[in-house]
Amino acid sequence: MTIKISIDCMGGDHGPAVTIPAAISFVESEPDAELILVGLADQLWAELKKHKAGEHPRLSVVNATEVVTMDDTLEAALRRKKNSSMRVAINLVKQGQADACVSAGNTGALMAISRYVLKTLPGVDRPAICSILPNQKDGPTYMLDLGANVDCEPQHLHQFALMGSALVSAMEGKPRPTVGLLNVGEEDIKGNDIVKQTAVLLRADHERGTLNFYGNVEGNDIFKGTTDIVVCDGFVGNVTLKASEGLGRFVKSVLTTEFKRNPLTMLGALIARSALKAISQRLNPSRYNGGSLLGLRGLVFKSHGGADAYGYQWAIKRAFDAAKYDVLARISTKIADLMPQSALTPLPEDSVTATEQ
């Protein structure tokens, strides 16, 4: 079965210089993938020809006359640039011409346009960016929100927990994945009012048996793998994500420097070569690139704006896998079962608060 993914090739810090090589590498490694490259056609064709892929049978180009920049306001992105590469790529999902969309562009704009075009699932106020981080148990820790909503109310964090539970249940085959609420301590008395009120909602779900709420977790629990899911607002999540990426690069840099310090340490590096390679791979943030905008009536994936071609390729892979295993339908069913009947009416599409990832 062929899976079609639309790519916003103009998004991110590097645009086609990263998105095109990533698309070529992915489509060559995945025979069931077909990629629709959206952007300024002249630039896309030039990059394709540069990589001798201008006639690839599973790469097609759709022209878009505008580009959403990182500096664009939400109004400009949503109301004025209606033929932007981001908007056109998302429209392809809405029209059924693509199974999923990937963009490294302005996070706020991506969320606003996705909500406007695709709409949210019943009972969901705001989409949340959910992605995975590595942990000591050699498995994934799913974390949300990672930057879509910098300001949240308790009901939003509550919905994030339910959506995260639905996602992990579908992706990992766990009927009752554990949910942790990120806080400054494990004790119930700690945290701000929003976190405390959210904990009350999650405990009520736990008592009803609709959510497996572990309780409050701290930052170090993310990488311990204490819970399957960690819930927080987008401000905290985005800072945590980028701090962890920076730490991974720092550790890799320190290891490289120290093992090159003298002949003896270089010999040690040679002996431990296979282990060091494995460590480097596990700590490489590019391998964890690609977060889903959870809660939409379509699959949209957000790549880090500064991702290189290798990292962007991982974002495409996550979108491909989600479409291949029909994750959207499975999550929709799970959310419908988990969401309370009194769920809030979705907010207007343009009432979005977000940070740029």
Curated annotation (Swiss-Prot):
EC annotation from Swiss-Prot or TrEMBL: 2.3.1.274
Localization per record: Cytoplasm
Naturally occurring in which organism (per UniProt): Herminiimonas arsenicoxydans
NCBIfam families found in the cross-reference section: plsX
Protein's job: Catalyzes the reversible formation of acyl-phosphate (acyl-PO(4)) from acyl-[acyl-carrier-protein] (acyl-ACP). This enzyme utilizes acyl-ACP as fatty acyl donor, but not acyl-CoA.
Entry keyword annotation includes rRNA-binding: no
SUPFAM superfamilies membership: Isocitrate/Isopropylmalate dehydrogenase-like
Superkingdom per UniProt: Bacteria
Name the UniProt record assigns to this protein: Phosphate acyltransferase
Catalytic activity field: a fatty acyl-[ACP] + phosphate = an acyl phosphate + holo-[ACP]
Membership in a protein family: Belongs to the PlsX family.
One MF term in the entry's GO annotations: phosphate:acyl-[acyl carrier protein] acyltransferase activity
HAMAP family: PlsX (MF_00019)
Gene name of the record: plsX
Alphabetical GO biological process terms: fatty acid biosynthetic process; phospholipid biosynthetic process
SS bonds (residue pairs): none
Pathway info: Lipid metabolism; phospholipid metabolism
Subunit structure, interactors included: Homodimer. Probably interacts with PlsY.
InterPro entries: FA_synthesis, Phospholipid_synth_PlsX-like
Keywords for the protein's UniProt record, in alphabetical order: Cytoplasm, Lipid biosynthesis, Lipid metabolism, Phospholipid biosynthesis, Phospholipid metabolism, Transferase
GO cellular component: cytoplasm
